[in-house]
Regions:
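Short amphipathic alpha-helical/adjacent loop interface patches that line ligand
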Residues: 23, 49-52, 100
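Conserved alpha-helix/loop element of class I SAM-dependent methyltransferases that forms part
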Residues: 28, 32, 45-63
């Protein structure tokens, strides 16, 4: 957790507790359902959580903003971003049901109230969002083709 605090020192106590809980939760779930490379679980905070939060160094999402995390897998980048931005609404989507289950269980375990989940392919998402985030899902050109219809037209 120290690496998160190094880059985001102004976290509330609740956010600190939520980030701290992630390691044990993901280690437990990863032993049942492979959502993070077993060789990489020791680097959870540096390779997954901090990487997910990188966007927060260049943009501050306004309260009420809606963001879709496309191809969330076990909840990256959506869950770390939902912790960091508790007043922003996140919708996490993945085509693999067991990964959506892990993300849902992790979010529930740490008390996140600003996330919803959907087991679906990206092309099936009908709602629109202010932003779409994604991490290691597909080539960017392919991703752009899929998400064009999900971005609010005033963005």
């Amino acid at each position: 957790v120290e690496i998160i605090l190094k880059y985001f020192p102004d976290l509330t106590e609740e956010q600190r507790k939520q980030f701290a809980a992630l390691y044990d939760l993901y280690t437990d779930w990863n032993s049942k359902i492979n959502v993070i490379s077993r060789k990489d679980i020791e680097n959870l905070y540096e390779h997954h959580v901090l990487h997910s939060l990188g966007i927060a160094k260049v943009i501050q999402f306004r309260p009420g903003t809606s963001i879709m995390d496309l191809g969330t897998g076990g909840g990256f980048p959506g869950i770390p971003l939902a912790i960091l931005f508790p007043e922003v609404k996140f919708h996490l989507v993945d085509s693999i049901g067991k990964k959506v289950r892990v993300a849902t269980e992790v979010a529930n375990a740490i008390g996140l109230k600003n996330v919803t989940f959907r087991h679906a392919r990206a092309e099936e998402e009908k709602r629109t969002f202010d932003f779409v985030v994604s991490r290691a899902v597909m080539p960017l050109a392919d991703l752009i083709k899929i998400i064009k219809k999900t971005i609010c037209s005033d963005r």
